[in-house]
């Protein structure tokens, strides 16, 4: 199946906004086994939009239009598609009720006739409810070509796609099942090298590597009759892949940390803290609270995290954490001594089960004769205080801080698994 994405909005063409919807939709279509062959952007102009729809209908099986569903006169997507399909626009009862409920809570005068446009759908289409906005989407098939209209705001589009469109397309078209494996501690080029025979000779299942900042994912996909068969095929391939070793001789299983497109090292670590009923604190220097803010972003974070420290200067490290200033000056802030002292003092001061620390050189300049990207991460438990040195080279200051935070989460994750004898 060939799909085409059409982004509608003059603001995209003028560079006022970035078309992040195209990337999101392309990923979702890939998960469903639907190939996106074309991406088009067109302004808020009926004639040009008609031309784009006509072209898409001649070369694609699935045409997805994003944007132009709002209440203003330049929101023309549904109206133009209806004109092309020679269909009427009708009102969706559920969308009308949502409009009524929305404006019932506001001044009656704030509701104008053009608001009603958001509740319209193309006659004969399947409405796609909008959980986070007012403009209803839709799905319709005419003469063997399927058309989808989606709202432009990314928060509305993502919700509609995940909750409405993906289940609908899954029933109609797809028998593709996927599993995403996540790795930290190995680069994409090395991963592709050690798995080159699998990747070069792949048929079904397929293997698709993706590089992200600081980590790599592998998407394993298979077309089969049901989930049980897919699980068997993907599970067998996964076992074969994880049995391979990196160029340094480390099993890939050691750098594999979890599953899922939307998963993360931070989430895995947070869930382990909750599972094993452990509390954590952090003392941060170069990351300036990034570890703590990431951890606090998860609902229920207060179960495992009560607070921590951000101490940038040597003097603040001494004052906030009670570390001897002369010893700090002797060893330097970019050192194992400082990292271990920060982690242990943070743990003792808060009473947490685990203390973690990050200190180092974010860059771009050297510090204490250490190059940019040099990071020491400390970790303290009741039984042990340790640290690791990480060199994050060739990265921006922002990425050094982000990747350092990933290393800290990974260190905590591995410690938790060791405590439970799972690693």
UniProtKB/Swiss-Prot annotation:
It holds the Pfam family CinA. Signal peptide: none annotated. It comes from the Bacteria. Belongs to the CinA family. PANTHER family: NICOTINAMIDE-NUCLEOTIDE AMIDOHYDROLASE PNCC (PTHR13939), NMN AMIDOHYDROLASE-LIKE PROTEIN YFAY (PTHR13939:SF0). This is Putative competence-damage inducible protein. The lineage of its organism: Bacteria, Bacillati, Bacillota, Bacilli, Lactobacillales. The gene is cinA.
């Amino acid at each position: 199946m060939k799909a085409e994405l059409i982004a509608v909005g003059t603001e995209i063409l003028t560079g006022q906004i970035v078309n992040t919807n195209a990337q999101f939709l392309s990923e979702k279509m890939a998960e469903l086994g639907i190939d996106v062959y074309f991406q088009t952007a067109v302004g808020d102009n009926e004639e040009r939009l008609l031309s784009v729809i006509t072209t898409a209908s001649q070369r694609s099986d699935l045409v997805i239009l994003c944007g132009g569903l709002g209440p203003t006169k330049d929101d023309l997507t549904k109206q133009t598609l209806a004109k092309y399909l020679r269909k009427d626009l009708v009102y969706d009862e559920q969308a009308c009720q949502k409009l009524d409920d929305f404006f019932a809570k506001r001044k009656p005068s704030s509701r104008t006739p053009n608001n009603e446009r958001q509740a319209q759908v193309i006659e004969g289409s399947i409405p796609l409810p909008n959980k986070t906005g007012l403009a209803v989407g839709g799905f319709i098939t005419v003469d063997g070509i399927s058309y989808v209209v989606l709202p432009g705001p990314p928060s509305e589009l993502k919700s509609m796609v995940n909750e409405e469109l993906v289940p609908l397309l899954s029933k109609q078209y797809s028998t593709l099942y996927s599993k995403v494996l996540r790795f930290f501690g190995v680069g994409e080029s090395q991963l592709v090298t050690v798995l080159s025979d699998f990747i070069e000779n792949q048929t079904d299942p397929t293997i698709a590597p993706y590089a992200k900042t600081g980590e790599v994912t592998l998407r394993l996909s298979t077309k089969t009759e049901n989930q049980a068969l897919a699980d068997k095929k993907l599970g067998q391939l996964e076992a074969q892949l994880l049995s391979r070793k990196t160029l340094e001789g480390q099993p890939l299983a050691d750098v594999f940390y979890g599953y899922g497109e939307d998963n993360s090292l931070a989430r895995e670590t947070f869930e382990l803290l909750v599972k094993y009923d452990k509390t954590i604190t952090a003392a941060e220097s170069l990351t300036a609270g990034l570890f703590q803010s990431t951890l606090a972003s998860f609902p229920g974070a207060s179960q495992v995290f009560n607070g921590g420290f951000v101490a940038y200067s040597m003097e603040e490290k001494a004052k906030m954490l009670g570390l001897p200033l002369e010893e700090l000056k002797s060893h330097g802030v970019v050192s194992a001594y400082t990292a271990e002292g920060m982690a242990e003092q943070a743990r003792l001061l808060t009473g947490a089960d685990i203390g973690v620390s990050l200190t180092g050189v974010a860059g771009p300049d050297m510090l204490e004769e250490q190059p940019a990207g040099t990071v020491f991460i400390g970790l303290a438990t009741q039984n042990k205080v340790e640290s690791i040195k990480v060199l994050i080279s060739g990265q921006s200051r922002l990425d050094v801080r982000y990747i350092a935070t990933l290393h800290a989460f990974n260190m905590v994750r591995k410690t938790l698994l060791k405590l439970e004898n799972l690693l």
